[in-house]
């Protein structure tokens, strides 16, 4: 009886193993066939930025500003304008910035203005949301909005809108910064940094990314197709967490954008425009001014940075409140 049982068990186990083997082989065959069916492209090693350039400004965007009371600072001379990308429904994130690093409008007599960049949430947007955004803008006067869809893949359109708005409606700003709602900005340090610059023209800085490879894998957020970007390496560019530029570059970059087809990544797109304009990125001597990845910064470290990425709205409020206290830092 026992020997018969032992004879049956191995045969069942063998059958189970065979089933799993066949399943794995089927999956492997499927992926091989899928991969072979994909169009294959030769990655271009040597980058030619003129590949992206059109002599006529055929890529000039004609989206419309949609708010009735349009944001305008053409009659002001702000030292710094900070433009923050935001989603229409993310009121909490905007409010967190308004009561923390974006609240103070003057630092040592230098005017700093903060505005939020929005698109349209859906093709047929909810009327209540549209009205609430109008009310929010009437209350704070800090929203810039156009009628393109507000999606991750349209972030480049949002950046083009930012450059257009500064060029047309806020041309006197001495410096301009573009950042995101999940970034903690130490506004005081930013103003000090700009005041200590030796030059104020052809200046562009942030968290530099040099020889960054284009990603062709499965993760859609960071994937870019060969058709959209055929080169192996991206141009030198500054991460979208926060880049800063002098006034003279804004209209030049905006004009160049009309000649360069938008790509998925807005910061890379700006980098392409900079390379075509032959503008070099200024790399800060202090490598701890910009933090790209979320790290466990304490309050004393935040007192020394300009921008740190990866903060929730609640964390921005908490860290700002703690940073304002008279905590002694010994390092």
From Swiss-Prot:
Sugar-modified residues: 72, 154, 198, 212, 326
Cytoplasmic domain ranges by topology: 1-20
Class of the enzyme per the UniProt entry, highest EC level: transferase
Pfam families named in the record: Galactosyl_T
One Gene Ontology cellular component: Golgi membrane
Pathway info: Protein modification; protein glycosylation
Coiled coil regions, renumbered to chain: none
Keywords for the protein's UniProt record, in alphabetical order: Blood group antigen, Glycoprotein, Glycosyltransferase, Golgi apparatus, Lipid metabolism, Magnesium, Membrane, Signal-anchor, Transferase, Transmembrane, Transmembrane helix
Gene: B3GALNT1
Lumenal side, ranges: 44-331
Upper taxonomic lineage: Eukaryota, Metazoa, Chordata, Craniata, Vertebrata
Tissue specificity field: Higher expression in heart and brain, and to a lesser extent in lung, placenta, kidney and testis. Lower expression in liver, spleen and stomach. No expression in skeletal muscle.
InterPro entries: Glyco_trans_31
Broad class of the protein's primary localization: Golgi
An example molecular function term from Gene Ontology annotations: N-acetyl-beta-D-glucosaminide beta-(1,3)-galactosyltransferase activity
Transmembrane segments: 21-43
Name recorded for this polypeptide: UDP-GalNAc:beta-1,3-N-acetylgalactosaminyltransferase 1
Cofactor names: Mg(2+)
Record family assignment: Belongs to the glycosyltransferase 31 family.
Gene3D superfamilies referenced in this protein's UniProt entry, alphabetically: 3.90.550.50
Location within or outside the cell: Golgi apparatus membrane
């Amino acid at each position: 009886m026992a020997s018969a049982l032992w004879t049956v068990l191995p045969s069942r186990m063998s059958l189970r193993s065979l089933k799993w083997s066949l399943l794995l082989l089927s999956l492997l065959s499927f992926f091989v066939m899928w991969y072979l069916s994909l169009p294959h492209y030769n990655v271009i090693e040597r980058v030619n930025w003129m590949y992206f350039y059109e002599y006529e400004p055929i890529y000039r965007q004609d989206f419309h500003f949609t708010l009735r009371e349009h944001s305008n600072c053409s009659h002001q001379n702000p030292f710094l304008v900070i433009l923050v990308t935001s989603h229409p429904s993310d009121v909490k994130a905007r409010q967190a910035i308004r009561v923390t690093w974006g609240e103070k409008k003057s630092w040592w007599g230098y005017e700093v203005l903060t505005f939020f960049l929005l698109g349209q949430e859906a093709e047929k947007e909810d009327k209540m949301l549209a009205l609430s955004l109008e009310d929010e803008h009437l209350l704070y006067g800090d929203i810039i909005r156009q009628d393109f869809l507000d999606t991750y893949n349209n972030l480049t359109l949002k950046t083009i809108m930012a450059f257009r708005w500064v060029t047309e409606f806020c041309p006197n700003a001495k410096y301009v910064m573009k950042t995101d709602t999940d970034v903690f900005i130490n506004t005081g340090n930013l103003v000090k940094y700009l005041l200590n610059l030796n030059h104020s023209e052809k200046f562009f800085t942030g968290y530099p990314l040099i020889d960054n490879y284009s990603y062709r894998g499965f993760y859609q957020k960071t994937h870019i197709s060969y058709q959209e970007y055929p080169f192996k390496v991206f141009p030198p560019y500054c991460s979208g967490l926060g880049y800063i530029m002098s006034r003279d570059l804004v209209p030049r970059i905006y004009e160049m954008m009309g000649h360069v087809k938008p790509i998925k990544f807005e910061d890379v797109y700006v980098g392409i425009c900079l390379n075509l304009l032959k503008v070099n990125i200024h790399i800060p001597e202090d490598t701890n001014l910009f933090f790209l990845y979320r790290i466990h910064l304490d309050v004393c470290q935040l007192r020394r940075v300009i921008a740190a990425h990866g903060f929730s709205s609640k964390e921005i409020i908490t860290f700002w409140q703690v940073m304002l206290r008279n905590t002694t830092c010994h390092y």
